[in-house]
Regions:
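N-terminal Rossmann NAD(P)H-binding glycine-rich loop of SDR-like oxidoreductase domains
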Residues: 11, 19
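Substrate-binding pocket helix/loop in short-chain dehydrogenase/reductase
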Residues: 88-89, 96-98
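C-terminal helical subdomain
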Residues: 166, 173, 189-227
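Catalytic loop of short-chain dehydrogenase/reductase
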Residues: 126-152, 157-158, 162-165
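Rossmann-fold cofactor-recognition segment
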Residues: 44-58
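Conserved NAD(P)H cofactor-binding loop of Rossmann-fold oxidoreductase domains
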Residues: 80-85
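Conserved glycine-rich Rossmann-like NAD(P)H-binding loop of the short-chain dehydrogenase/reductase
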Residues: 25-40
């Protein structure tokens, strides 16, 4: 039986690299991003991609319909999409918080809720968080909306693991340190770190395919630098 993985935030960075890795390993991949063109341009036979916005309710129905009609089950969900805002708290409006939380928290929760009925024992929901969302970690000015949203999905993961513990579905969260992605460069111009999207994608691929054998409801910190 084919293995099925859904990845959000696939137009660039870590998500883009993950799609290529899962495709190379023979998985059936559903790649979701507001801009589907970068993935479609790869012309990978085992990858389906269409425009998807975590803040739009109708887009979730499109995903649910696809999974129900084409796959029937999902082995791995990687909640990778994220919105990063670097802005002084005094200038961060309610609308700014809503924008970040719609993608980083509400979208993650809804995607997981929609996909769970298609998962089974040893299926894995892996959410990508940030070191900034970890209690006691170094914090950075300007990241009030972003880091607090990343803390929220850490707690969500722990709650899911408890609520669904009888199903055998596993939920884990990775708190990443800084990775040299376009999103990081946009938020922190000139900031450079040694970790590349491809290197981090290597780790996430391995953990998403094997981590559920050893962990459930766990936060793992994956960082040699911050934020």
């Amino acid at each position: 039986m084919s293995k099925h993985v859904i990845i959000t935030g696939t137009s660039r960075g870590i998500g883009f690299e993950l799609v290529k890795q899962f495709s190379e390993k023979g998985y059936q991949v559903l790649a979701l991003s507001r801009n589907a063109k970068p993935i479609l341009d790869l012309k990978l036979l085992n990858v389906t991609a269409f425009p998807f916005d975590l803040s739009k309710k109708a887009d979730f129905h499109k995903v649910e319909t696809f999974v129900k009609n084409e796959w029937g089950h999902v082995d791995i969900l990687i909640n990778n999409a994220g919105a990063l805002l670097n802005k002084p708290f005094s200038e961060t409006t309610l609308e700014d918080f809503e924008f970040v939380y719609k993608t980083n928290v509400f979208g993650v929760a809804e995607m997981t809720r929609v996909i769970l009925p298609f998962m089974k024992t040893q299926s894995h929901v892996l959410t990508i968080s940030s070191m900034g969302g970890v209690q006691g970690s170094m914090k950075f000015p300007g990241l009030a909306a972003y880091s607090s949203s990343k803390g929220a999905v850490i707690t969500l993961t722990e709650l899911w693991a408890e609520e669904y513990k009888e199903t055998g579905i596993c939920f884990n969260v990775l708190a990443l340190g800084a990775v040299q992605t376009e999103m990081l460069e946009e938020a922190f111009p000139g900031f450079e770190v040694p970790m590349t999207p491809k290197s981090m994608a290597n780790y996430i691929f391995d953990f998403s395919t094997t981590g559920q054998k050893y962990y459930n409801g766990k936060l793992l910190q994956v960082s040699n630098s911050t934020p």
